[in-house]
């Protein structure tokens, strides 16, 4: 008997009809001889609606109370899924994140999982019940306050539970039936991938693929939890994410796909003294403010005045905070000016095959040249090339790269209604 953890996204649970459909799939998995644990996201746009409601009563709501509010969304879908399963004649028991033993750090709004002690879930499984766990939430061990895990936290909840329970697989259900060589909404002939290594999926998640959140893939890799991305609208087996890139024979390594990201902003700090410790001053201030940095470029030092410029990208949502912080430091005479640009985007090519295919970077740049796209920043890893370009050029760049590296197929991809969550 296998233990299967299934996670259902908000689009899969947005109505009573879809909840009943999900319940039928869950019960079928149980009847096939499996133990089943289900992690639920909030229904449809519930989380966004709760955020709007909070803003209407308090423009700056307390973080603790915001977590108390937002976790209600998952508890609602949790209970409804359990009810639907019971209506089909199977036994189900729902749990909040706290009841399921999801222990987190104290940071409200973006807590990290530190441990999972799913004793009550294990007991219910032993009694033959289907266990339904509210995603996106946990509890701080010291304060006992409810916490939330940030956007995409239900994916992380599912993988963490799968690891703690020793599950055979963690299935992530949404409105897409797998991981594609590109977003089918941008590149119609994108092809579904049957299998990816953890490293390839980590790179795709890090550079903009919305199918899985980065933290969930990091967790799966750390605890070697196989993941399968599937659609709740079909019976297609989807994409399996498992194993290491090192296990892929060199001759079989391929270029995996193209991803785009519209969530970053570019910041340039001008006139920084070109001497030891000055760049560290910039990035220490940003780190202390918990602002993540992605791409970085430092210009050649100016001979005339001994200064340099540093350009970096950060989440667009953190851009105003970064600018406020750096402008304050500018007033202290640390540098001459700070520039901000939020009309940028990142396009990336990922694949284990880069290690064995000379000339990938040249072909990448030629593809962008052919569609008249200018590159502003470049970042690479062993299996990834990313460039920063104008946001308006993202779609045509993705299409050009996808065609250049022959990643497409003869048929158009099937796109179900929804957003990929």
Curated annotation (Swiss-Prot):
Keyword field: Amino-acid biosynthesis, ATP-binding, Diaminopimelate biosynthesis, Kinase, Lysine biosynthesis, Nucleotide-binding, Repeat, Transferase
EC number annotated for this UniProt entry: 2.7.2.4
Catalytic reactions of this protein: L-aspartate + ATP = 4-phospho-L-aspartate + ADP
Binding site for substrate: 25-30, 45-49, 74, 125-126, 151-154, 274-279, 292-294, 298, 360-361, 374-375, 381-382
InterPro entries reported for this sequence: AceGlu_kinase-like_sf, ACT-like_dom_sf, ACT_Aspartokinase, ACT_dom, AKii-LysC-BS, Asp/Glu/Uridylate_kinase, Asp_kin_monofn, Asp_kinase
CDD domains: AAK_AKii-LysC-BS (cd04261), ACT_AKii-LysC-BS-like_1 (cd04913), ACT_AKii-LysC-BS-like_2 (cd04936)
Gene Ontology molecular function terms on file: aspartate kinase activity; ATP binding
GO biological process annotation, one example: diaminopimelate biosynthetic process
Protein origin, superkingdom: Bacteria
EC top class named in words: transferase
Site residues by UniProt (Contribution to the catalysis): 7, 74
Domain ACT, residue spans: 267-343, 349-421
One GO CC term, this protein: cytosol
This protein's pathway: Amino-acid biosynthesis; L-lysine biosynthesis via DAP pathway; (S)-tetrahydrodipicolinate from L-aspartate: step 1/4; Amino-acid biosynthesis; L-methionine biosynthesis via de novo pathway; L-homoserine from L-aspartate: step 1/3; Amino-acid biosynthesis; L-threonine biosynthesis; L-threonine from L-aspartate: step 1/5
Annotated residues for binding of ATP: 7-10, 41, 174-175, 180-185, 210
Quaternary structure and partners: Tetramer consisting of 2 isoforms Alpha (catalytic and regulation) and of a homodimer of 2 isoforms Beta (regulation).
Functional description taken from the UniProt entry: Catalyzes the phosphorylation of the beta-carboxyl group of aspartic acid with ATP to yield 4-phospho-L-aspartate, which is involved in the branched biosynthetic pathway leading to the biosynthesis of amino acids lysine, threonine, isoleucine and methionine.
Similarity comment: family membership: Belongs to the aspartokinase family.
PANTHER family xref list: ASPARTATE KINASE (PTHR21499), ASPARTOKINASE (PTHR21499:SF3)
UniProt name for this protein: Aspartokinase
Lineage start: Bacteria, Bacillati, Actinomycetota, Actinomycetes, Mycobacteriales
